[in-house]
Amino acid sequence: MPSQPEQLVDAEADSVPPPSAPQMPSKASRILLGLSLVLIAANLRPVFSSVSVLLPEIIDGTGMSSLAAGVLTTLPVVCLGAFAPFAPRLAQRFGAERVLLAVLVVLTIGTALRGVGSFWSLYMGATLAGAAIAMGNVLLPGVVKRDFPKTAAIMTGLYTMALCGGAASAAGFTIPIKNMLGGSWNLALAFWAIPAALVLVLWLPQALRSKHNVAHSGFRVVGLWKDPLAWQVTLFMGLQSSTAYIVFGWLAPILRERGMSPAAAGGLVSFSIMAQVVTCLLIPSIAVRQKSQSFINVFLCACASLALIGFLYLPQWSFWILAIIQGIGQGGLIAAAMMVIVLRSPDSHTAAHLSGMAQCVGYILAAIGPLVVGMIHSATGSFAASGLFFVILWIGASINGWLSGRARHVGARTINKEA
C-alpha cells in the first residue's frame, strides 16, 4: 500500500525527459517556493464559494432565473472537466511553472471580470476562472510532490489546508466585504481577484527563472476506459464532487431560505468548509492502512449527504451540528476519492491517466448537481424539493464508493513508447 507521501498524483508522470526540481541555492528561496505553491492553492476555490453567498443578490441584480443561476454555478465545474486534460501537455511544452503563471493571469482576469456585474460578464468570468482552476488542480499536486519530495506529507497537509482555507475565507468574508463596498455585490465578487494578482506578482520571477526542456509523452496506458473499476472510481469522484459543488454553490442560499441572515449563512458555510480540513488530513493515513476502503467511503457518503438533506428539513438550531457532520463527510470524501485513484493504480503512469479520466468525466458529471438544484428551485420556488435528488446522489456515490474501495487494481497496462 502507498505511504502517506504518495497521495499526490503527478500529472507529468509520462513526460520524457522527466521534469526536475528547480535549483534552490538558499533556504529562503525554498521557503518562498513552498509559500507560493500554498498561496496558489488558496486561490483555487474562492471563485466557487464567493458566488454562493451572494447568489440571491446576483439573481435580484441581474434578473436571472434560478435555472440561470444554476448554470452560473455549474460553468466553472464543467470547465474543471473540460480543460483538465490539456494541462499535462501544456506542462510538457512550456513547463509547469510557466503554465501555473498563465493560470494565475487567467484566474485574475476571470475573477475581476465579474466586477462588471452584467449577465454575460459573470458567465465569461466563470468560464475563464474555471479553465484556470482546472489547470491548477491538475498540475499543482505534481509540482508540490516534485519540488518537496522529502517533506511531501507536510506539503500535502499545507496544500489541503490552503484549498479549504481559500474556500472558507471567501464564504465567510464576501458578505462583510460587500457591506464595506457600499452593498455592491459585483465589486465583492471582483475583490477576490486581488489575492490572485498578489500571488501572480510573487510567482512571476520564480516562473520566469525556471528552466524547462521540451518534453513528450514517453508512455501510454491502454485498456483504462474499458475497465469497470476505472469507471467506478470515476463515478465515485463525480458523484461526491457533485455534492461538494452543491455545497459550494447552493448551501448559503438554502440557509438563507431557511431564515438565516446573509452573514450568518456565509459564516456557517465557512465553518463547514473548515471542518473539511480535519478529515482531509486524517482519512488518507487511515485509508492506506486498510485492505479495503469500501466501508470508509460509504460512511463518509452518509455523513455528507444526510447532513445536506438535514439543512432542508431540520430546525435551525441543528444547523451548526449539521455543518460539522457535513464538513467531516465532505472533506473525507475529497481525500478518499483521490486516495482510491492511487490505491487502484498499479503504477504512477496509470495513476496519472486514471486521475485524468476521473477529473475529466467526473467533474462534468459533478456539474450536473448544481444545475439540477437550480432547475428544481426554478420549477418549484423552493429548495425543499431537492431532497429526493440529494438521496439519489447519496445512493449513487455510496454504491460506487463501495465498489471502488475494494482491494484490487484497474485492468490497464502501461506501455513504454521508448522501448
What is the meaning of each model-derived region?
Residues 291-337:
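C-terminal transmembrane helical hairpin of 12-TM major facilitator-type secondary transporters
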Residues 348-383, 390:
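A late C-terminal transmembrane helix in Major Facilitator Superfamily
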